[in-house]
């Protein structure tokens, strides 16, 4: 198990280094954890697509992971097509990405800078007060606010929020 975590860490680092000079790297990468059958994750796909569309121009990259032991290339491709997800998304059937980045539920995001430092971890927004309890009005747009701060060169606050969603199985 420890070997798999080391390999995954090395692959993430190699993917970062392989791009070349740091100025060529994205300002930050939003790692998005999703599940095909999670209603809260499904709900947030539109918001994530809109954020990607807006912030990709600002140098923010998005990577999606379907953290589900049953996830396959085919199931992820079908999910991506059904919900029109514009960024790369891959199966995380081994849960190695979720374990490496500390994701516990879907949807959950982890924003890392070009050096791999975690800047933010948590919910996309506060649409859901609890599992199955959707607010009438979303009052906190956490991920959008983090990305806005990053593009303006401001400090990211808060550093984390509690994500509400479907549990990622513990390994």
PLM feature spans:
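Short, internal strand/loop/helix patches
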Residues: 80-119
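Hydrophobic h-region of N-terminal signal peptides that target proteins for export
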Residues: 11-20
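Short, thiol/selenol-centered motifs that function as redox-active sites or metal-ligating centers
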Residues: 35-46, 69-70, 109, 166-169
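Sec-dependent signal peptide recognition
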Residues: 3-11
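Short active-site neighborhood of thiol/selenol oxidoreductases, capturing the structured segment around
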Residues: 25-39, 62, 147
């Amino acid at each position: 198990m420890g070997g798999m975590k080391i390999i995954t860490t090395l692959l993430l680092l190699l993917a970062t280094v392989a791009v070349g000079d740091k100025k060529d790297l994205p300002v930050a990468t939003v790692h998005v954890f999703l599940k095909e059958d999670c209603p809260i994750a499904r709900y947030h796909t539109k918001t994530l697509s809109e954020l990607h569309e807006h912030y990709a121009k600002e140098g923010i990259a998005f990577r999606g992971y379907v953290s589900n032991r049953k996830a396959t290339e085919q199931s992820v491709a079908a999910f991506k097509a059904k919900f029109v997800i514009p960024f790369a998304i891959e199966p995380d059937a081994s849960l190695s990405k979720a374990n490496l980045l500390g994701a516990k539920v879907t949807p959950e995001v982890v924003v890392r800078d070009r050096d791999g430092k975690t800047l933010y971890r948590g919910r996309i927004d506060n649409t859901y007060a609890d599992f199955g309890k959707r607010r009438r009005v979303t009052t906190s747009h956490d991920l959008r606010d983090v990305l806005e701060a990053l593009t303006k060169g401001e400090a990211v606050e808060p550093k984390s929020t509690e994500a509400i969603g479907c549990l990622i199985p513990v390994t």
